[in-house]
Amino acid sequence: MLTFAPLNFLAIGVGATLGAWLRWVPGLRLNGAGWPWGTLTANLVGGYLIGVMVALIASHPEWPAWIRLAAVTGFLGGLTTFSTFSAETVDMLERGVYATAAAYAGASLAGSLAMTGLATVRLLLR
């Protein structure tokens, strides 16, 4: 059972800060007016890494809760971003680029699910 221990709060906070910074950099470098490659990249990489962490945590029940909280809830929660994805999709819809919005939404959702599943399956089959 998780508790509201100070170490858990610190783990989430540090992880979230690092994840958000890492999400910000590809957004600066890769996001363009037509397609937000930086956000898509962050979400796909984050989805894959969440799968990795789910498999690693499942195979190491002795790990303390703060490790999962720092890595998954904090870092990967800060790296991946449903709110930015949603805002970018709505912006595309408002600009009338419906096919681009649909493609971006589909690529983000299907890609993130595929990356998470790929990582989880690969590690669990070891």
From Swiss-Prot:
<feature type="transmembrane region" description="Helical">
    <location>
        <begin position="101"/>
        <end position="121"/>
    </location>
</feature>
<keyword id="KW-0812">Transmembrane</keyword>
<keyword id="KW-0406">Ion transport</keyword>
<keyword id="KW-0472">Membrane</keyword>
<dbReference type="GO" id="GO:0140114">
    <property type="term" value="P:cellular detoxification of fluoride"/>
</dbReference>
<dbReference type="GO" id="GO:0005886">
    <property type="term" value="C:plasma membrane"/>
</dbReference>
<keyword id="KW-0997">Cell inner membrane</keyword>
<keyword id="KW-0915">Sodium</keyword>
<feature type="transmembrane region" description="Helical">
    <location>
        <begin position="2"/>
        <end position="22"/>
    </location>
</feature>
<keyword id="KW-0813">Transport</keyword>
<protein>
    <recommendedName>
        <fullName>Fluoride-specific ion channel FluC</fullName>
    </recommendedName>
</protein>
<comment type="similarity">
    <text>Belongs to the fluoride channel Fluc/FEX (TC 1.A.43) family.</text>
</comment>
<feature type="binding site">
    <location>
        <position position="80"/>
    </location>
    <ligand>
        <name>Na(+)</name>
    </ligand>
</feature>
<keyword id="KW-0479">Metal-binding</keyword>
<dbReference type="GO" id="GO:0062054">
    <property type="term" value="F:fluoride channel activity"/>
</dbReference>
<keyword id="KW-1003">Cell membrane</keyword>
<dbReference type="Pfam" id="PF02537">
    <property type="entry name" value="CRCB"/>
</dbReference>
<dbReference type="InterPro" id="IPR003691">
    <property type="entry name" value="FluC"/>
</dbReference>
<keyword id="KW-0407">Ion channel</keyword>
<feature type="transmembrane region" description="Helical">
    <location>
        <begin position="65"/>
        <end position="85"/>
    </location>
</feature>
<comment type="function">
    <text>Fluoride-specific ion channel. Important for reducing fluoride concentration in the cell, thus reducing its toxicity.</text>
</comment>
<dbReference type="GO" id="GO:0046872">
    <property type="term" value="F:metal ion binding"/>
</dbReference>
<feature type="transmembrane region" description="Helical">
    <location>
        <begin position="37"/>
        <end position="57"/>
    </location>
</feature>
<keyword id="KW-1133">Transmembrane helix</keyword>
<feature type="binding site">
    <location>
        <position position="77"/>
    </location>
    <ligand>
        <name>Na(+)</name>
    </ligand>
</feature>
